[in-house]
């Protein structure tokens, strides 16, 4: 074994099985590319990305951990989002939630 080496089973790994998902069309109205990471609370992404933010509160991109999606200026694309799990509390990012997601549903 080499230090840091991974030994994984052959085949596919199912991610986020059984979690709530949604699809949303996002358009970059800015003049620069915007990249969003896998675990960023999607409702709090750069304001130049236009979409229904209320619909995606409590969701993140449904992509493998450590990856990202890039939105070029003027680009419109549909993305799939997956609900946050666990304690469902969001802290940081743009500071718009700062606590349990359910407390912000009102």
Swiss-Prot record:
GO terms for molecular function: urease activity. Keywords: Cytoplasm, Hydrolase. One of its GO terms (cellular component) is urease complex. Its EC number is 3.5.1.5. It holds the Pfam family Urease_beta. Gene3D superfamilies: Urease, beta subunit. PANTHER family: UREASE. This is Urease subunit beta. The gene is ureB.
């Amino acid at each position: 074994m080499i230090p840091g080496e991974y030994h994984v089973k052959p085949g596919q790994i199912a991610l986020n099985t059984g979690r709530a998902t949604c699809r949303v069309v996002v358009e970059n109205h800015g003049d620069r590319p915007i990249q969003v990471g896998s675990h960023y609370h999607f409702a709090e992404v750069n304001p130049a990305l236009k979409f229904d933010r209320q619909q995606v509160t409590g969701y993140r991109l449904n992509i493998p951990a450590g990856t990202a999606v890039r939105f070029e200026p003027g680009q419109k694309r549909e993305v799939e989002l997956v609900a946050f799990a666990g304690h469902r509390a969001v802290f940081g990012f743009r500071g718009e939630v700062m606590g349990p997601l359910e407390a912000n549903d009102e």
